[in-house]
Swiss-Prot record:
GO terms for cellular component: axonemal microtubule; cytoplasm; cytoskeleton. It comes from Danio rerio (Zebrafish). Its main location: cytoplasm. Residues 145-164 are annotated as: Disordered. It is found in: Cytoplasm, Cytoskeleton, Cilium axoneme; Cytoplasm; Cytoplasm, Cytoskeleton. This is Protein CFAP276.
């Protein structure tokens, strides 16, 4: 076979290069390199303005209320042994700042409260006055496999067992 022959039949499929020709590489709008352009506005202002989280990560940050050792963590915890008995370790050292003390996020808290109040309008909460027994099958989802008999199978209406 001659080497000039195209092995792919017609119609030839078009792609990005054959349809519109070669595309130009997009040029940067600035002639400055990136490391020099970052010294101008708005880059400089964004870099120099600290947030609460970024200021805590700096070397010079010192918070007088932070616990210094394990004893301080346990003493400042929001855990009350009389109210929360048999909680796991992570719940016993939960700090007030994490639980919900005001730590400077006032705007987020106001938004949260307004959303919750708007969502809960018209919802009635019902609490059962009598605690139901764990072993009662009353009100359970009906199925032919329940633990209401010795073998774990329910009985048919005629007294026999269901089988699969």
């Amino acid at each position: 076979m001659p080497q000039e022959r195209d092995p792919f039949p017609f119609p030839r499929y078009e792609n990005d290069f054959t349809l519109t020709g070669r595309k130009e590489i997009q040029k940067l709008s600035d002639d400055k390199p990136t490391h020099l352009a970052q010294n101008d506005e708005p880059w400089r202002r964004l870099h120099n303005t600290t947030t609460e989280a970024s200021s805590r990560r700096t070397v010079f940050h010192y918070d007088t209320t932070t616990p210094k050792d394990s004893l301080d963590i346990h003493l400042k915890a929001a855990y009350d042994h009389h109210l929360g008995l048999f909680q796991n370790k992570s719940q016993t050292v939960m700090q007030m700042e994490t639980v919900g003390a005001d730590n400077g996020t006032k705007k987020n808290k106001e938004l949260e409260d307004s959303v919750c109040d708007a969502e809960n309008k018209g919802i009635k909460v019902w609490v059962d006055t009598q605690k139901a027994s764990l072993y009662s099958i009353k009100g359970s989802i009906e199925s032919h496999h329940t633990a209401s008999t010795n073998r774990g199978y329910s009985r048919k209406h005629d007294g026999g067992f269901y089988s699969t």
